[in-house]
């Protein structure tokens, strides 16, 4: 069935460049249905190009302005489709490295790209209980943003190299580096140091054949083209990098066994909302009511242990089961079921 004929649409009607286009749910059609003319002109080649389509933008009314901005965001998301194969290869390579030992996930970048990857890094602990000791952030200018971004640091390759060496990177580590234009001297220098240390390197950029792409082992490119406001890569390029880095880390955590079905069973409940979410997950997975789930959750302290406890294991048996399964709840439950089937 042609997805464009489906009654279920990703978006019903999307205005782009003064025309209305309909998108289907199939991602291949999303990329194909983004109009290249008049949206893209002869100068619309990279993130620093000027799209003549938006000449006079400052005179447009708010509705036209928002339509243009929405079109830029939509086109950026659609540009991610072509990056999925390279993204998949990067996820597989990273999961092999990180599953084999205690390697770290190192995030590097400058400016808006650096902030995007830093945000992804900071979410890992609460969402997936990824150890803080296995996460590092190399943001140009540092993480103290109380006095602004410190944009000059983007050009400081020497500082980048020194900070990367201070981490004592090695073959067990994975370095995720982002630069919209692929030209940040800070980010390129970190990847070069990582390659020397034989760490796995994954670059996220929005330009083909960039300096960053040439030095990284895996390159994930979303060719977002010129921005609605020329050079403002916090717009379309930033959106594409947020989409792709979030997909990378999420798929990576799934591959590492931190997700059961589509539940984030490694969730660390640090507030009331997280605790309620944890109880609901336990109830759904263990197929018990929320009162029983809440009791098990309170007794065992986390989702996976509560589920295994509700399966009839003592606290000591829960620890043994999870330890033998490398923390993977699906493996632990499967082994428990197999053992019980074998019992007379």
Predicted regions and their residues:
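Short, amphipathic alpha-helical interaction segments embedded in low-complexity terminal/linker regions
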Residues: 252-344
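Gly-rich Lys/Arg/Thr-decorated short loops/hinges at beta-loop-alpha junctions or inter-strand turns
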Residues: 47-48, 68-76, 136-147, 260, ...
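A short, well-structured juxtamembrane/interface segment
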Residues: 82-99
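Short, positively charged patches
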Residues: 48-52, 88-92, 104
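Glycine-rich phosphate-binding loops that contact phosphosugars or nucleotide phosphates
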Residues: 2, 17, 105-256
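Cofactor-/ligand-binding subdomain signature composed of acidic, glycine-rich
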Residues: 5-79, 83
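Residues at the C-terminal ends
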Residues: 99-100, 196
């Amino acid at each position: 069935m042609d997805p464009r004929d489906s009654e279920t649409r990703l978006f019903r009607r999307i205005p782009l460049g003064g025309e209305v286009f309909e998108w289907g749910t199939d991602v291949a059609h999303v990329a194909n249905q983004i109009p290249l003319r008049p949206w893209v002109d002869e100068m619309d080649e990279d993130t620093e190009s000027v799209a003549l389509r938006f000449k006079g933008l400052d005179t447009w009314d708010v509705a036209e302005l928002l339509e243009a901005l929405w079109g830029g965001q939509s086109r950026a998301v659609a540009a991610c489709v072509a990056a999925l194969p390279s993204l998949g290869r990067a996820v597989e390579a990273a999961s092999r490295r990180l599953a084999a030992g205690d390697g770290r996930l190192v995030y590097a970048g400058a400016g808006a790209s650096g902030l995007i990857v830093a945000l992804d890094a900071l979410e890992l602990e609460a969402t997936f209980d990824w150890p803080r000791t296995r996460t590092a952030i190399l943001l140009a200018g540092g993480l103290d943003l109380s006095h602004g971004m410190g944009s000059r640091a983007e050009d400081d390759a020497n500082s980048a190299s020194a900070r990367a060496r201070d981490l004592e990177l090695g073959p067990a580590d994975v370095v995720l580096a982002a630069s919209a234009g692929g030209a940040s001297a800070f980010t390129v220098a970190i990847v070069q140091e990582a390659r020397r240390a034989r760490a796995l390197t994954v670059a996220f950029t929005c330009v083909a054949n960039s300096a960053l792409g040439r030095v990284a082992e895996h390159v994930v490119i979303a060719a977002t083209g010129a921005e609605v406001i020329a050079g403002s890569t916090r717009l379309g390029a930033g959106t594409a990098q947020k989409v792709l880095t979030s997909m990378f880390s999420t798929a990576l955590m799934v591959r590492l066994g931190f997700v059961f079905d589509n539940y984030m069973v490694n969730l660390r409940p640090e507030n009331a909302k997280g605790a309620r979410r944890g109880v609901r997950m336990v109830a759904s997975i263990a197929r018990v009511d929320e009162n029983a789930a809440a009791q098990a959750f309170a007794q065992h302290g986390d989702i996976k242990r509560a589920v295994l406890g509700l399966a009839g294991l003592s606290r000591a048996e829960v620890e043994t089961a999870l330890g033998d399964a490398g923390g993977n709840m699906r493996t632990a439950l499967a082994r428990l079921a197999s053992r019980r089937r074998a019992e007379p």
